[in-house]
Amino acid sequence: MLSPKTTQITIYTTSWCGPCKSAKRFLADQGFDFTEIDIEKENISREEMASMTKGLSVPQIVINSKPIGGFEDLLEYFKKG
């Protein structure tokens, strides 16, 4: 079971990404803090992001140093507990 107090979450986003907004809202609604990295503002290429997350699309979510994937993957991850 994930604990909001001990779970480290990083979400790679862009400003125009609808699923990114949904993922951030979902995490906030669940009581989780997260670090957001806007790849456009931070000038991170998708290839650089993929080397850290294993994915080219946004959002890419990393929980406790483990790449989870996108928004649908996040929902599945929480469903499994």
Question: Residue spans of the language-model regions?
Answer:
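Thiol-based oxidoreductase modules, predominantly thioredoxin-like and allied folds used
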Residues: 33-45
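Thiol/disulfide oxidoreductase modules built on the thioredoxin-like
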Residues: 51-57
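Non-catalytic, surface beta->alpha helical segment in thiol-disulfide oxidoreductase systems
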Residues: 63-81
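Structured loop/turn residues at beta-strand edges in well-structured enzyme cores
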Residues: 32, 56, 69
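Short alpha-helical
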Residues: 18, 44, 69
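Short secondary-structure transition/capping segments
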Residues: 4-5, 46-50
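Nucleotide phosphate-binding site architecture
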Residues: 18, 40, 75
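Local sequence-structure signature of Cys/Sec-based thiol-disulfide redox active-site neighborhoods
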Residues: 1-33
